Amino acid sequence: MQTVEEFARQVLAGMEDAVPSALASVREQKAFALDAQENVGPNNPDRGDVLDIRTHNTAVSQFLDNLLKLKATLTLMRGGDGMDPEFAAEGLAVPLTDYLWAIEYEKQRIDLFGYVEARGFFDSTYDLACALRTTPELHQALPACKLVVCDELHDINEASFCIIETLLNVHQPYFVGVGDKDQVIYSHLGADDAFLQYRIAASFPDCATFPLSMTYRHGPHLAYAMEAFKNKAVESNLPLRTEIYEAPYADQPGACGQQVVEAVLQWQQDGKPLDACCILFRDQHQSIDIENALMQAQIQYRTLTMHSYLQRDEILFLRGMLAIALGDFHHVASPETRAAIVEALATFAEVPLTPQELSEAKATIARDPATLEYFFEGQIKRVGNPAARARIERAVEYLRGLEPAAPAHAALAAVCEFVEMEKLAQRLYVHPYEASVVTKCVSGFIATARNLNQNLPDFSAWIGTAEKVAGARPGKATVLLDCVANVKGKEFDHVILPFLDQGEFPNPLRTLSEEENLFYVAATRAKSRLTLIPAQDPARRSPFIARMQLAGTLNRANNAVRRNLAVPTATAGRRDLKVAYANKDAVKSLGAQWDRTRKVWYVPDHLDLEPFRNWLAEP
């Protein structure tokens, strides 16, 4: 079992004599990208007036995202096509600088003779797809398989499809593919429902298709709600009533967070484990109100892949401004957070530091917080972007001139005006949607200060305390938090969806079809309970809730549960195992299987338990 990337890496290893260096981490790939960026200006001297070359972390991250998109869609084909770069970049909806940077990146990665120096994330897929497209005689290098099974076809992109299509054409194995067009949510990475809708059928006319209409995750109540929402057949034979609750929140500060807390506490009172409950956000700015409410209720939580709001770049920047103005960095206890604040200050002040200079500054200030003042005086005020550093200097002077009792929220709002935060976000983040999320995060941070009604020193101290809570080592009694886009393929007993409002979900800056798919993914992560938290005002509610037709499908779902309960079921004979990591290969070789959801090894019911006696868990 392999991902397409792993498969491509294996095929290339059999074709190439040398082994390319592996850019195994984001840090290594960013360093490689910065090396390539140095060639963009010299190799494009006639475009110096339109190039926007920046070295800060946000710019490099956005470049790597655009590079991945170009490779996934095979729109950065090797050798170029003679197209004018300005025209090509505009047509591909990427900044000209990033397009030219991508060309230099690939020239640095692969020389004129085809020697590959390095490979990072997705590069094996891209390299193999390019080779198969340009050199048909390489098709025979693909392994001869009798059976090919592909899951998650809704995530497929042009490069991956090229490999799968060639593999099937060359050796003509039996093929089984599984995908759900309603789960296409990664269009920014080249995913497209066209592959499921007609591309596969066009390439393989004899391929039979079957509907994905049965769910084994949740019961009929949620199945029929999703059937109504997506206008497609969905059925569940589980004898399970998946509860769906609506908990509208009032139009007042903290109300949505309070409803989330009540939903979590009710789940706990029902005797359910907190770590089986996950709060899913449309995007990360929504977590601010919820994290604050959980902290206030003393409910421990942990984020899965997203950062706590106190660790996001725009909030770290404001925290850095406060620390400089107050001369108070000791409330930031974590050296890692101090280093992150330095990087955020360098990014938002547009300080042109080399990676080595930035690394040294981060290490120094993480060790000795008092040196933050020297960073402000010696770097931000001296070499930062002239306009940006002037605005930041005025903001710091303003903060230093405030009375100690001045309210923190008013001070932060004034700082955002001084630095022109909305314009700054739009300048740093190319895509309007990403800039809007940054702006909303900042607004949420200011709202937090307003709700606490504290002065600047007290608010700074509160942030330090809150960060310790958010960063505490989680125990088992821990609620989970993440963004919807990060949890596709996962499932949770209880899913809570807050802020189901107009303008939030669906988001007007995204295509409606992909927003529908994202909501579908969010709701269908739930197994036994789904809690929807919309605005109390019907005019502000997300239209997605009405489309679920919860009242209209209720009787049918009740009847289906009764029907499913009446069906006799065989007693499941599978037994869980208690296996140390060192013994996993042993039980696997005996036929044990791994339950990804429950994170436990088990013996299927058709196997004899005797060989597993030493690992049997208590029934």
Task: Identify the function of each model-found stretch.
Residues A202, K272-A413:
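ATPase/helicase motor core of nucleic-acid motors
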Residues E158-E246, Q549:
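Conserved RecA-like helicase ATPase core segment
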Residues P205-T209, S213-Y301:
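Helicase P-loop NTPase motor core
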